[in-house]
């Protein structure tokens, strides 16, 4: 039904007065309906038809409204998975020395953060620690904005040692953030918060050597927040992304695209482990890991 104008109405040529068409639709059954509104005109002596496609649907649910609120003081849970192989000593030192750059965004935006650290080794002397949050010399496992001597504690935690061998961030990250480790009071209980964004930050100079395909770990990590809140999880990597290591730096193997897959699937950030400017690299990682939510997921698929 067209309201506001009668059928067969003619618009005077050269008129500058706009004509408004208001269409009303009322379904008579369930399901999709289509139609068209046709405007017949004559331009330059030639008849033309302008067709406006119409779509409608009859359903039982009616209008669905989703409401999203951005936290004024966002929360972020950050798991650092740090390569503890023999070639990582200088990289761990650089990470510790540039803590302020990593935390710059969180500090300036008053982010309520949890930071935990675990290592990559899966099969030798440090394998028992992989997936378990490390404790500092003072017994601190979870760093918070209120943690005393935060810089000292951070430097202590990220110095995970260099006695490891096989290197994987995906496997220990998944172990750390899922049951039974995440609910075990002797391991990682208290780290995850339901209303906080979650970020894994992998720091390694090697391709990921986890035994399963990346999609296996991705699905488990995404399930932590759930399909409707997938935008609350990111996977970020400081790793070996150049064809070969530049002079003065070293890789423990070249990139095999497994890191790239995890980053791209979660809208994470990747930075070069052999960067000449750790401050800038960690600042970019920090902005993404600690940042406000940028993706909001609807509860139902819209009719578009």
Residue ranges of predicted features:
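Feature for long, exposed domains in two main contexts
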Residues: 1-64
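Divalent cation-coordinating acidic motifs and surrounding scaffolds
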Residues: 55-304
């Amino acid at each position: 039904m067209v309201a506001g104008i009668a059928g067969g109405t003619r618009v005077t040529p050269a008129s500058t007065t706009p004509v408004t068409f208001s269409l009303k639709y009322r379904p008579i059954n369930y399901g999709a309906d289509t139609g068209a509104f046709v405007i017949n005109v004559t331009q330059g002596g030639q008849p033309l038809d302008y067709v406006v496609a119409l779509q409608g649907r009859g359903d039982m649910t009616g209008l669905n409204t989703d409401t999203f609120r951005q936290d004024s003081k966002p929360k972020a849970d950050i798991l650092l998975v740090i390569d503890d192989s023999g070639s990582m000593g200088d990289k761990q030192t650089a990470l510790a020395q540039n803590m302020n750059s990593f935390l710059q965004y969180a500090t300036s935006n008053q982010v309520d953060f949890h930071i935990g650290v675990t290592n990559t080794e899966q099969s030798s002397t440090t394998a028992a620690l992989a997936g378990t949050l490390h404790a500092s010399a003072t017994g601190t496992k979870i760093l918070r904005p209120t943690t005393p001597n935060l810089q000292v504690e951070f430097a202590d935690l990220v110095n995970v040692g260099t006695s490891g061998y096989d290197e994987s961030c995906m496997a220990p990250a998944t172990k750390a953030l899922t049951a039974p480790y995440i609910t075990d009071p002797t391991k990682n209980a208290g780290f995850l918060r339901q209303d906080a964004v979650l970020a894994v930050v992998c720091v390694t100079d090697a391709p990921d050597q986890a035994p399963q395909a990346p999609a296996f770990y991705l699905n488990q990590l995404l399930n932590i927040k759930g399909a409707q809140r997938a935008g609350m999880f990111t996977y970020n990597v400081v790793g070996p992304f150049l064809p070969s290591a530049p002079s003065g730096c070293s890789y423990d193997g070249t990139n095999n695209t497994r890191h790239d897959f995890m980053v791209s699937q979660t809208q994470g950030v990747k930075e070069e482990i052999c960067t000449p400017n750790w401050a800038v690299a960690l600042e970019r990682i920090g902005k993404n890991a600690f940042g406000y939510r940028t993706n909001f997921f609807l509860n139902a698929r819209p009719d578009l």
